[in-house]
Amino acid sequence: DGAVKYAFLNLLATTFLLIAIALLYGMTGTLSMADLAGKVAALPDDAPIETIALLFLLSLGMKAALFPLHFWLPAAYHTPIPAVSAIFAALLTKVGVYSLIRVFMLVFPDSVEIARDVMVWVAVATMIVGALGALAETDIRRVISFTVVSGVGVMIGGLAIGSEAALLGSTFYIIHSIIVSAALFMAAGMIARAGGGTRIADLAGLYKGSPFLAVAFLLCGLSLAGVPPLAGFWPKVYLVQAGLEAGAFGVVAGILVSGFLTLMLIGRIFALVFWRSAPEGSPAAASDGGAMMKGALGALTVLTFVVGAYAAPVSSLSGRAAAELLAPGPYIAVVLGRSEQAATRAPEVRP
């Protein structure tokens, strides 16, 4: 079921993406993003740029798991082995989000203004639906899958606002989400080993046998909710400040509500899976995994704390990325300059 949904939705998204690319190429004669930045802005007013921009939003939004086309992600991410799920959660949706940010800030900067209302409500709906879906699930791996969906909404919220502070927050959140999503899926795999399954109702008392796993899961979950001083706190602060300054109160409300729901969710899972006593006569917990898995989870958990406690380097890096997104002139000049040099150096073809 998960494979069918994943394959169908991604095939459909790729089809829409190719249509958008073909239309854009037909009007501009180029696919270089640096070249497109100038040529799209020079197109006449009657050119269907808004339609093409919405096609990009639809296709890349499907790949990023934006609401209402997010349902493939929880169906697909909980089925592979934990290591594969961790890689999927860390990278795949982030590629879609990164592509949306690059395309809309470089090729369609004016369309960001036009599509702002659509992006705002899609982002808010993705945050809330993801968090509510996680609360409603009974399988811990599906729960974490829905938190990935909610995080995608937070990232797109920064694009919808469009300011430098908002893009800084989105970039920082991408880095945070890569770390935490991978860690939580690895923790879910270790929980399945220790407890013999991933159904929350069947799990109990794992703290006694796996205190390291319990602490790592709790810290990564709190980071996901945006609790200081962990890594998830700072990007949400930047996004909330940017939303208040821009009057994007829907995005601010979505971030705060989804964060509160995530905090409730992590507290419920920790209480049921780790803290409550196992029923009398239940088998003892098995090993929660090998040294490599524990080492990887420990490293990601420490990284989550370090990035939160010493956020200045990541904030600086994210800030530079945001500034370049809003002022892409140097990037365009470098790319087009290299293209012109390559063209002049190309050997002449003689008959």
Which role does the model predict for each range below?
Residues 1-228, 234-237, 241-263, 267:
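Hydrophobic transmembrane alpha-helices and their helix-loop junctions in integral membrane proteins
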Residues 29, 221-239, 302-324:
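Alpha-helical transmembrane segments and their membrane-interface junctions
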Residues 80, 200-201, 207-215, 268-351:
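Cytoplasmic/organellar membrane-interface segments at the starts of transmembrane helices
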